[in-house]
């Protein structure tokens, strides 16, 4: 088989928050494919980087009182540790905020500009007059122009699903300051995407992406492609556009160039020929693994940019679906929005690698992580089937046969059946049909266990006349196990490493065609523990605690101005006796600027209360009304007399004070519960 040159990427994770199990699907999928290609002997490289630019990162850094670079580094350290602990092995992990990315972004931009593919237009944008910044879509909220729902984002409505421009919002507000944005003109730079329409139509239907995605992207051509805004105004964290002071590359322009930059960084360190992989006439293969939500960036904008800048286009763009948990969208309140680190604190990372592989196909379907099925499948397949083969054979080899396998292979036809599965399993991995590969491997594991069950070496070993047969049964069992683990090596690299140490053998893909005979092995050690549901449940509970739902609060709202107090115990709250009271009489208090003297009827007794509501109410406006009072508050002696309770009211003060009024049907003396 000829050696191929292969460059593999996953989408660059945005450096603005922790990794969760939904993110990990893509990196596990890509890592499995990368490991498989390397096992085939190909020159394959898997690169990635932090997506480090944009307004959200800039603002997040400001909140923390650190620089954007420091904010990115903080997230990157945590993320790379998570990736490493999930056995995701990059050949290089870099950052889009790098010298390589700056140089390549400028190179591509200059080539596009020189070729006439960069246009300039003046546009009107919402601008925060208090913060002095143009507002991205998600930094504006207001009332939906379609359904009139309040507190909706600047680009789409969560209530009715409508999409719109931020300028279409009713009563828009800046998320940053609460101020009403103003419209302000600015010159922006645009990439002339329509100039590449013919090329894109042909490229999309040349087998470069899944057919269902190609059909979906055809919708972009129905109304005609639009020029793409590739600039943002200062202040902005990113790279300044050449010869355009105060203008910066939009994050989605330099983010995919980050693939090139990370590989360039690797090339410079390892002496690899960069142009052999990226030149327009390159015969290397380039594969992008991405989520289905960013397909249009990678299959419209990105190939057009590469074409216009005289670089090669991707060989394939592989899109995958989203992760659900227990059949539902990941939920913080239910504890199913699980961070990578929370998982790692409780469970073996290879459990998840296997479960994802067992459900992944080459299509674009969402993957459900059903936690009960997850435990059952790992326990049944890996512990009950695969590891069980070795655990039932290894001990006899060590104790009875000096730790050496037999000199001959009994039932060579059975071993050949396992070896003959290599081309089929190879094809499944190549086509990203991991679930099919797993099904075929597990079917072989069933056959291995059936062989051992029928041969019963634990019975043979007790018969002195059948020692050789017992030796050969256990030796064949371990040879079958060796083939299975080799097939699983891209999925379970840590287990494969441990098996290599146990068998004293390098598990090479073409090595399955040979048998281990008269071969010494080491003492068997447990390779995998069963998944315990109490640990799964503990992980879910910890996710509820560590990822408790946070509500986005309008900075101009009462809740933002006066946050909720610390929690109290229910017993403390139960001590407060709230009662409905009728304001029988209200009077001005001589010498008091803020107080009214209220006589409250509790339906059997009266109380005198001094309330600081004079700025909002005249006495005659509230006499006869029902309100709510704290009836068991210890009387307090004031300069104007004794106050025997407290009336409940809301508001920031001044004219904005609002007495609480119980609903119709309430009577004086009733307890409020």
UniProtKB/Swiss-Prot annotation:
<dbReference type="Pfam" id="PF19303">
    <property type="entry name" value="Anticodon_3"/>
</dbReference>
<keyword id="KW-0067">ATP-binding</keyword>
<dbReference type="GO" id="GO:0005829">
    <property type="term" value="C:cytosol"/>
</dbReference>
<keyword id="KW-0862">Zinc</keyword>
<comment type="similarity">
    <text>Belongs to the class-I aminoacyl-tRNA synthetase family. MetG type 1 subfamily.</text>
</comment>
<dbReference type="InterPro" id="IPR002547">
    <property type="entry name" value="tRNA-bd_dom"/>
</dbReference>
<keyword id="KW-0030">Aminoacyl-tRNA synthetase</keyword>
<dbReference type="GO" id="GO:0046872">
    <property type="term" value="F:metal ion binding"/>
</dbReference>
<dbReference type="InterPro" id="IPR041872">
    <property type="entry name" value="Anticodon_Met"/>
</dbReference>
<feature type="domain" description="tRNA-binding">
    <location>
        <begin position="572"/>
        <end position="673"/>
    </location>
</feature>
<dbReference type="InterPro" id="IPR012340">
    <property type="entry name" value="NA-bd_OB-fold"/>
</dbReference>
<dbReference type="GO" id="GO:0005524">
    <property type="term" value="F:ATP binding"/>
</dbReference>
<feature type="binding site">
    <location>
        <position position="332"/>
    </location>
    <ligand>
        <name>ATP</name>
    </ligand>
</feature>
<feature type="binding site">
    <location>
        <position position="160"/>
    </location>
    <ligand>
        <name>Zn(2+)</name>
    </ligand>
</feature>
<dbReference type="InterPro" id="IPR004495">
    <property type="entry name" value="Met-tRNA-synth_bsu_C"/>
</dbReference>
<protein>
    <recommendedName>
        <fullName>Methionine--tRNA ligase</fullName>
        <ecNumber>6.1.1.10</ecNumber>
    </recommendedName>
</protein>
<dbReference type="InterPro" id="IPR015413">
    <property type="entry name" value="Methionyl/Leucyl_tRNA_Synth"/>
</dbReference>
<feature type="short sequence motif" description="'HIGH' region">
    <location>
        <begin position="13"/>
        <end position="23"/>
    </location>
</feature>
<feature type="binding site">
    <location>
        <position position="144"/>
    </location>
    <ligand>
        <name>Zn(2+)</name>
    </ligand>
</feature>
<dbReference type="GO" id="GO:0000049">
    <property type="term" value="F:tRNA binding"/>
</dbReference>
<feature type="short sequence motif" description="'KMSKS' region">
    <location>
        <begin position="329"/>
        <end position="333"/>
    </location>
</feature>
<dbReference type="InterPro" id="IPR023458">
    <property type="entry name" value="Met-tRNA_ligase_1"/>
</dbReference>
<dbReference type="GO" id="GO:0004825">
    <property type="term" value="F:methionine-tRNA ligase activity"/>
</dbReference>
<dbReference type="InterPro" id="IPR009080">
    <property type="entry name" value="tRNAsynth_Ia_anticodon-bd"/>
</dbReference>
<keyword id="KW-0820">tRNA-binding</keyword>
<keyword id="KW-0694">RNA-binding</keyword>
<keyword id="KW-0436">Ligase</keyword>
<dbReference type="GO" id="GO:0006431">
    <property type="term" value="P:methionyl-tRNA aminoacylation"/>
</dbReference>
<feature type="binding site">
    <location>
        <position position="157"/>
    </location>
    <ligand>
        <name>Zn(2+)</name>
    </ligand>
</feature>
<dbReference type="Pfam" id="PF09334">
    <property type="entry name" value="tRNA-synt_1g"/>
</dbReference>
<comment type="function">
    <text>Is required not only for elongation of protein synthesis but also for the initiation of all mRNA translation through initiator tRNA(fMet) aminoacylation.</text>
</comment>
<comment type="subunit">
    <text>Homodimer.</text>
</comment>
<keyword id="KW-0547">Nucleotide-binding</keyword>
<dbReference type="InterPro" id="IPR014729">
    <property type="entry name" value="Rossmann-like_a/b/a_fold"/>
</dbReference>
<keyword id="KW-0648">Protein biosynthesis</keyword>
<dbReference type="InterPro" id="IPR029038">
    <property type="entry name" value="MetRS_Zn"/>
</dbReference>
<dbReference type="InterPro" id="IPR014758">
    <property type="entry name" value="Met-tRNA_synth"/>
</dbReference>
<keyword id="KW-0963">Cytoplasm</keyword>
<keyword id="KW-0479">Metal-binding</keyword>
<feature type="binding site">
    <location>
        <position position="147"/>
    </location>
    <ligand>
        <name>Zn(2+)</name>
    </ligand>
</feature>
<dbReference type="InterPro" id="IPR033911">
    <property type="entry name" value="MetRS_core"/>
</dbReference>
<dbReference type="Pfam" id="PF01588">
    <property type="entry name" value="tRNA_bind"/>
</dbReference>
């Amino acid at each position: 088989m000829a050696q191929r040159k292969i460059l593999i990427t996953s989408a660059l994770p945005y450096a603005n928050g922790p990794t969760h199990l939904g993110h990990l699907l893509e990196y596990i999928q890509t890592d499995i494919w990368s490991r498989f290609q390397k096992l085939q002997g190909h020159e394959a490289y898997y690169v990635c980087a932090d997506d480090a630019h944009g307004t959200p990162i800039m603002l997040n850094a400001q909140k923390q009182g650190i620089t954007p670079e420091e904010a990115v580094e903080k997230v990157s350290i945590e993320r790379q540790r998570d990736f490493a602990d999930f056995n995701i092995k990059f050949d290089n992990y870099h950052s889009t905020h790098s010298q390589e990315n700056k140089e390549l972004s400028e190179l591509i931009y200059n080539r596009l500009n020189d070729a006439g593919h960069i246009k300039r237009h003046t546009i009107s944008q919402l601008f925060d007059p208090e913060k002095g910044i143009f507002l991205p879509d998600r930094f504006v909220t207001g009332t939906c122009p379609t359904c009139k729902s309040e507190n909706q984002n600047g680009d789409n409505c969560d209530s009715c699903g409508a999409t719109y421009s931020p300028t279409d919002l009713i009563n828009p507000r800046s998320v940053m300051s609460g101020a009403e944005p103003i419209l302000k003109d600015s010159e922006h730079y645009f990439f002339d995407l329509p100039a590449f329409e013919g090329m894109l139509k042909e490229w999309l239907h040349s087998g470069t992406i899944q057919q269902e995605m190609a059909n979906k992207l055809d919708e972009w051509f129905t109304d005609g492609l639009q020029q793409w805004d590739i600039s943002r105004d200062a202040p902005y964290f990113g790279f300044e556009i050449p010869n355009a002071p105060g203008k910066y590359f939009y994050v989605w322009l330099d983010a995919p160039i980050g693939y090139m930059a990370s590989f360039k960084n690797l090339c410079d360190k390892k002496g690899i020929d960069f142009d052999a992989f990226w030149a327009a006439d390159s015969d290397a293969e380039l594969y992008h693994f991405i989520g289905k939500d960013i397909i249009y960036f990678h299959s419209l904008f990105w190939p057009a940019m590469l074409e216009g800048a005289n670089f090669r286009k991707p060989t394939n763009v592989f899109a995958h679906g989203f992760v659900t948990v227990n059949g539902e969208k990941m939920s913080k309140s239910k504890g199913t929005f699980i961070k990578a680190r929370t998982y790692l604190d409780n469970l073996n990372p290879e459990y998840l690698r296997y479960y994802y592989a067992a459900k992944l196909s080459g299509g674009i379907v969402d993957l459900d992580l059903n936690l009960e099925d997850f435990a059952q499948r790992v326990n049944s397949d890996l512990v009950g089937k695969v590891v069980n083969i070795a655990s039932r054979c290894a001990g006899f080899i060590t104790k009875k046969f000096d730790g050496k396998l037999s000199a001959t292979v009994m039932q060579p036809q059975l071993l050949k059946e396992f070896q003959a599965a290599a081309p089929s399993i190879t094809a499944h991995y190549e086509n990203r049909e991991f679930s099919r590969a797993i099904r075929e491997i597990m079917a072989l594991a069933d056959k291995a266990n059936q062989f051992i069950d029928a041969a019963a070496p634990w019975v043979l070993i007790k018969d002195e006349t059948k020692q050789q047969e017992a030796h050969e049964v256990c030796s064949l069992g371990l040879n079958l196990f060796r083939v299975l683990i080799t097939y699983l090596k891209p999925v379970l690299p840590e287990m494969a490493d441990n098996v290599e140490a146990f068998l004293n053998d390098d598990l090479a893909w073409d090595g399955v065609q040979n048998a281990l005979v008269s071969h010494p092995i080491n003492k068997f050690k447990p390779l995998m523990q069963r998944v315990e549901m109490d640990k799964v449940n503990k992980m879910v509970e910890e996710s509820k605690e560590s990822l408790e739902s946070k509500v986005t609060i309008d900075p101009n709202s009462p809740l933002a101005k006066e946050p909720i107090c610390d929690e109290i115990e229910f017993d403390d709250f139960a001590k407060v006796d709230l009662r409905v009271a009728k304001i029988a009489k209200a009077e001005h208090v001589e010498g008091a600027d803020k107080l009214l003297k209220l006589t409250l009827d509790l339906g059997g007794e009266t109380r005198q209360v001094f309330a600081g509501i004079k700025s909002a109410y005249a006495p005659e406006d509230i006499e006869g009304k029902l309100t709510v009072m704290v009836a068991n508050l210890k009387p307090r002696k004031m300069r104007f007399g004794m106050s025997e309770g407290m009336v409940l009211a809301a508001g920031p003060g001044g004219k904005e004070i609002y007495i609480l009024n119980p609903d119709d049907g309430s009577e004086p003396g009733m307890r409020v519960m």
